[in-house]
Amino acid sequence: MGVAMAGFQCDAAKWRTLWFGTRVTPFASGLPFLRMPPFPGAVAHPLTVGCPTQRADSATGAGLMAALMAGRVGGRFWGTQPALPADRDIVLAPASSHEASAMFARAKAEELARRVLLIGSRFQRGLPGALQLGDDIDPWHLAGHASAVWTGADNELALVTALSGKPVTIFGQGRFSPLGEVDGYPDILGQLVADELLSAITYRDPFTGNAMDALAAIDLLAGWRRLIDRNRRTSAVFGVAQWKRATLDGLLWDGRRSPPYARSRGIRARALGQGDSALVWKSRAPAGLPDRLERGGVATGEIEDGFIRSKGLGANCVPPLSIVVDYMGVHFDPAQPSELEMLIQNADISPDLIERAADLRECLVAAGLDKYGQGRGTWARPAGARRHVLVTGQVEDDRSMLSGGAGCSNWDLIRRARSIEPDAYLIYKPHPDVEAGHRKGDIPDADVLQFADQVERSASIAALLDNVDAVHVITSLAGFEALMRGKQVTTHGVPFFAGWGLTRDLGQVPARRTADRSLDELVAATLILYPRYLDPVTRLPCPVEVLVDRMAKEQATVGSPLIWLRQKQGQLKTALKHIRRSA
C-alpha cells in the first residue's frame, strides 16, 4: 500500500530498491531501522517515509545513539527472545551462501563451531556442531547475549551489536560495512547512526500523520518496547469477555501472537505450572482461580479497566480503551500493595513528567472528560453562595467497594456526608451503571432526600465537579477527578488516592502509604505510568494524550448490536423498577 507524502510516492518495493537494495537478509528486511511493530488490528500512518532530500533534524549522532541504547529499539525489537545457552556466544548471521562459507571456514579454523549460534535456516548444513535458530529473534536480545557477532554488511544486527558495545565482524560490503572498516568503530558509530536515521527519511506521527523528529519516534518505539516486553511473560489470560478482546489484543500482544485467551485457545489452569504467568480479569473468572494458579507456582496478575475508560459504560458492553495490568495486587484493594501504590510511594517522578501530568490534567478538565468520556455539559449551582457538596453513589457489589469500601454503603455515605456537612447543599449523584439498570446500589429518591437536598441524574459528573465546593466518596474515581479540579475530597473508604496528603481520609489508610505527593505527581503515576491505552482510530497502543484527544473530538465512540441490546435491556429494567415503586 503506497502513502503519498509531500508529493513523493513511497511503497515497500520502491523503498527497498531506492534506499537499501533489493536483497532481504535476516534482520535486514529492506525497511528502515526505525519501524513500527505489527500490532494486531492496527491501521496507522507509516512511521517512516522516504524522501529524495534529507529533512532537517536537530538530533545529533550521539543523542540518537543514547536514545536507541536506552530504549533498545531499532530493527525487529519485537522479535522472539528464546533462552540462549551461555556457551553459545558467537552469533553468525550470513545473508548468502558465499558469506556463510566464509564464516564457516573461519569458525572451523578457530575451532569455534560448538560456540556458534547460527541465525537462519538456509545454511544449517555447513557447520556441524553449530546451534541453529530462526531469524525472527529480537536483535537486541541476540546482541546482549553474544560475545561477538559475525554478520553481513546489510544486516541491522550489525548496528544493534555495535550499539550494544559488542564486537562485530562484517562480511562483504553494504549498508553497515563502515563498522568493519576501522578499528574502534565507536569513533564512526555516531555518524553512521545519524546517516541511517536522518538521511533521506522523514518521520510521521502514526496517530496523526504529522511530522515528528527522530528522537520522538525513538521515544514512541521505546514505549511500545516496554509494553511488549511486559507481555512476553504471559502464558494465559482468563476471564476476558469476547467483546473486550478487540482492545486487549493490542495491549497484551507479545510481539508474535495474540493474547492466549484461555477459552479460545483451550488453555486450562491445570496445564500451567512453575515458571508460567497468567493474567485474570477476576470478575469473570471462575471463583478461586487466582488462588489455584498461585498455589501451582503460576505468577498471577490482574487486569482491570483503566481510569479513562471509554465513551460509554462497561455495563453496556462498551469495550474499554484503557486497562491496567498489575502483578502485585489490584489497585482498589488496600489489603495489599499494588503496582500503582508502589509507583505513588516510590517512583522518581521527574520535573518533565510532572509538567506533562499538569498539561494532561488541564486538558482533561478543559474537555470535561471523566472515566466514561461523557463530557462537561452545564449545571448551575441551585443554592448560590451556599457550600455545595457532591455525594457520589457507587455500584455496591463492585469489587472496589467490596475490597476498599470499609463496609460503607451508598445509604451510609449520604447520612455520613450530612453529619459532616450539616449546613451544606448536598447533591447525590447515582452511579451510571446503577441508573442503567444493570448493577446493585439503587436508593429510592424519597430516602435519599431525607438527608440530601437534590438527586441529580442528568448532569455529567464533570459538570457537577466543576461547580461544587467539595466531594464525598467511598472509593469512587470521582474523588480523584475532583482533586484534579482543585476540590476538597473526603474519602469514607480507602481508594488508591487516599493517604498521600491530598484528601481528608475517614477510612483506615494503610500505614505503608507514607509519601506526601503533589497533585501532579499523583496524576503522573495514576494516568501516565500505570495504565495502558489504545487509540480507537489506529488501534495502536498510545500515550494517554492521544486517547484524551480522540475523546474530546468525539472520535472514540463505539457502537455494536450488543451495546444497543444492553442499553435497551437497562432501560427496560429501570422502567420496571419505577413501575414497581409506584404500584
Stretches found by the model and what they are:
Residues M1-A583:
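Catalytic-core helical/loop segments in enzymes performing group transfer/polymerization on anionic/lipid-linked
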